[in-house]
Each structure stands twice: as structure tokens, then as C-alpha cells.
Regions:
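Exposed, low-structure sequence patches enriched in small/polar residues
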Residues: 1-232
Length: 232
């Protein structure tokens, strides 16, 4: 008498404890009343002054985001705290279909540098995971993503472009910003069966992307952007 191994009162607290690092004794039986995790974002620019002879900006950034969602839940109209189901266990007060946890370090680390000559360098690392518990078939689906980005940019200040459409002596004067970004992302999905020792890799992907862009401000109200995106 109590709750069986496949009861949601057992699976949900175990799921939350396993994937959040909480002590199972601190996880309640009702996931709706569970406290959300704290999100944060940290940025540090303090090194700019120390290296001001070379860099006009040095910036470090770190951020964490999490979402905990419950899909399709309903009250058990036949619930009675003194009644038992056909297996001799307590009835569930509420029925849940899916429990989902999404976490992102976006970014885990971001380094943004701008030199005195207007050359810009950037480096990003992003890590994320999405975990779903299906109480209909006792399956856990885990998806991980790792992403790495390198960026190179340059700003040409007060660049003059001659055109008969310009009102300022037939020329435009503005900043030309050019940027090149290269990105690598790897995804992996694993399905775990909670009733048997069966873990299967169901999907995986490696994505490489290249983006080249240039934008030019013709005046305060009008600007042009040219870009090229390529996935391979």
C-alpha cells in the first residue's frame, strides 16, 4: 500500500530531483507548487580601462535561463484520500501528462573585444538542454545542444559614397559595419525507458553556418544592409 514505482507521485519528484540536483526530500508531490529556479545574467567590462591603450572595449558576459512547464493536467474527480486503486495503491489527486525542463547557458561565456583601430573580435559558447517526462508511457526524452561561435568585424567610420541621390554634395557620409560569423552547433537526443534498461539515441545533428553582413547608414533615417547566410 502506498505509491508504486510508476506512480506520478514517485516519478515526478524523482525526475525533478535527478535533473535539477535538488534533494528528493525537498521536492513536493505536487509539481505545480514547486519553486522556480533563479535565472541570472552577468556582464563585466572592467578590463577596458586597464587595456585602454589597445582596446576600446573588453566585455565578458554569462547568462542562465530555465523554464519548467507542465502540460495537460486535470483533477481526478474520483479522488478520495482513503480509497485505493486496482493495484492497492493510493489514488492520485491530479493527473499530469508531461513535465518539461529547459535550461540554457546563453551564453555560457561570451567575449567581445573592440580594438582601437575599430576591429572587432567575438567568441561565444552556448549550452542548452531540454528534458521531457512523459507519464503516459514512462519515457524521458533528453536533448542537448552545444554551440560555438567566432566573429570578426570592422567599422569604417565616416566612409564617403558618391551618388546622385545624395543631398550632401552628391555623397553619403556614414559608418560601414562589416561582420563575419562562423558557427558550429551539435545536437543530440536520447530516449530513456523508465521501465527497462533501454536508452536509445534517436537523433543527432551537426550544423555549420557562415554569415557575412555589411550595413551602411546613408543618413539618420535610412540605412542599407547586405548579408549572406550559408548552412552546411
Amino acid at each position: 500500500i502506498g505509491f508504486g514505482k510508476n506512480s506520478q507521485e514517485v516519478l515526478i519528484p524523482s525526475f525533478i530531483s535527478a535533473y535539477t540536483g535538488k534533494n528528493v526530500q525537498d521536492v513536493g508531490l505536487n509539481p505545480i507548487s514547486d519553486k522556480p529556479k533563479i535565472n541570472w545574467s552577468i556582464q563585466y567590462d572592467g578590463l577596458t580601462e586597464a587595456f585602454k591603450g589597445v582596446f576600446s572595449r573588453i566585455s565578458f558576459r554569462h547568462s542562465y535561463r530555465s523554464n519548467f512547464t507542465i502540460n495537460n493536467f486535470q483533477s481526478n474527480l474520483n479522488y478520495n484520500e482513503n480509497s485505493f486503486n486496482a493495484s492497492g495503491n493510493y489514488e492520485s489527486k491530479m493527473f499530469f501528462s508531461n513535465i518539461n525542463l529547459v535550461e540554457q547557458f546563453n551564453p555560457l561565456i561570451q567575449i567581445d573585444l573592440e580594438l582601437k583601430n575599430s576591429l572587432r573580435l567575438s567568441f561565444d559558447v552556448i549550452k542548452d538542454r531540454a528534458i521531457s517526462l512523459s507519464l503516459a508511457n514512462n519515457l524521458v526524452t533528453e536533448s542537448w545542444g552545444n554551440e560555438y561561435s567566432i566573429g570578426l568585424g570592422y567599422r569604417a567610420r565616416n566612409l564617403k559614397l558618391w551618388s546622385r541621390f545624395a543631398s550632401n554634395a552628391n555623397r553619403f557620409i556614414g559608418d560601414l559595419n562589416t561582420k563575419l560569423d562562423f558557427n558550429i552547433r551539435k545536437n543530440l537526443t536520447v530516449i530513456r525507458n523508465l521501465n527497462i534498461d533501454d536508452n536509445k539515441v534517436s537523433a543527432g545533428q551537426s550544423v555549420f553556418s557562415l554569415r557575412i553582413s555589411a550595413d551602411y547608414a546613408l543618413n539618420r533615417n535610412f540605412s542599407t544592409i547586405f548579408f549572406y547566410d550559408h548552412l552546411f
